Amino acid sequence: LRKSRRTLHHARVSYIAEAVQRARHLGATPDGAAAWRELLAQTHVDEADYSDWCRELAALYVRQGRQLAAARIHEYLLNVDPALELYKAKGTARDLGRVLRIGRRTREATLRYKDAGLFGHAARAAEEAGDSQDALTLYEQLVRQKEATRDPYLAGLAALNAARMAQKLNQGDRVRTTLALCMRLLEEEGDRREQAGDKDGAFRCYLGLVQVGRIDKSYEPFAEGYLNCIRILKQKGDRFFTIQYYYDFIAASDELGELHSVAELHREAGEYARRVGFIYADYFLTEAAEAWLKVARMATEKGQSPELVENALLAAVSCFNRVQDDKNVAHCYTQLAGLDLSDKKKARYSDLATDLERLAAKATGRDPPAAFPEYFRRRLPVQEIWVRDLLEAENGSDIPDAVGRLIGDHKNVWEVQRRKALLISLTYDDHIAAGGDPERVPPALIESLAGFQHAAAVRPLVAMYDQGDEATKALVVERSAQLKQKEVFALIDRALSSSGRVREAGVAALRGMKSQPALDSLVRIFNSHEAHDVRDAALGSIAAVGTDEACEFLLDVLRSNPGNMAIKARTLLEQHAQERMLSSLERNRKQEPDQALRLFIGRLVERIRLQRGAAL
């Protein structure tokens, strides 16, 4: 085997050496350019060799009058000055601004973006230059622009960014003014979007409110944003996301020292989990009780009135009662009996404590609540939508802008992906140089985009979908699943809302989305669609993901969906049961109240263990 690999390596080296010799022999001819391009398709070669080939091709393109293609190659090489000179001839303000930022000439980039009316990009470049005052001015200009064009969402985001800059400049009055404007715009736009049925759009508005609270260090907008996000998730039936947002809200509230909110949110999450049949209700209710005990302790330490301590302890009693924890209920009543309350109350609490201690002593040991899984505990990543959505609104959707911006991004983009981005951009330039229609790209270019494996390919694919006929739309959607990026669901969603070949392509693409990052979107689509083929495709892909979390969702579908969908979930669990699902299955077998389902889960557990033994 080692000898075979060595032979293949020598053959590949020999092939490349011959290809380089051939390209040099062809000289400054179209065939010569094609030969260098063929070499650039070897995206895994050594950086020094690849850079040499790029320089040869760039020089050749300049001689052929292909300035734009040459500029893209120099951008890949991070040759800022040559790229700028070439982009000045044929490029756009976005091209120039992007290269200036690569060269850390952020002040020049700010001016370029500003002259082009790209105020979001200009403000971001000013931030990178450390010029918070200029960034503040630009963000405020963007607020006025978006208000004038009646785009309250982007105006609200611009105001949020202006507040960030004002905070850096210690301009307290300006922070308060811009945050007040931001809150008004995002609240109103969130309401409007909800009434229009755009729950996802409203959700983004409420995420903005969460950030307002973080900047202002005020709990009110922070809580308003989270509670509205949770409410929308409940309306959409996204039980998994609802629990995740509850947990994240609780953790964030705890960090802010909002103990009463922490206790109440635990209780609310527990009641919700019990209502929808999640087995983690007892975990949240127990945590709620413990949080109320902490509130009671702190009230006592601060010397607050006995009535406040009493209220907290009674809230803990209520939560412990919900999980039938008589021992801890008795302990709470003992503490209540020791408070400085009326003799009548103290006697009653003492009697209750005695009675419950007697009952608890006779009772058999109770199982602890099901452990809350680690994947639910993960803190949700902070989505900087207040920056990203502003920049995205100004970005072009053509290939040179959407994919081309990765070419010179050596800090955030893998080297091979930078090379693939360069090749896609050069192929697009070939199409334009040959007189092709920018809105009608050849199918081969669609294939290249789909095989790019980067979220940046989604935006041009969406543009091609919008501009294409039915055949083009279907091709774009079918190939989009190859991206294996969760962002591709923007296309799949649109295809599923269509008809004919396009909708069929959407369902087919859905069946191909089997990677772990796709799980959240698959769950969302399953919950938001009624069509059997869509739910069937989503559920099949969820099962193929095969993680602990996917297993949890399949069990939830099995419990809560009557008829064919429950049968489908059961079949998929039997087909896909694997080691990664074991912890979820064991947890659910222990807590499952339905005997038949408990036996089914037990059989899956035993089968996985047998497979594990056979593998050893």
What does each of the following model-derived ranges do?
Residues R204-L207, G404, E447, A463, ...:
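Residue-level signature of alpha-solenoid helical repeat scaffolds
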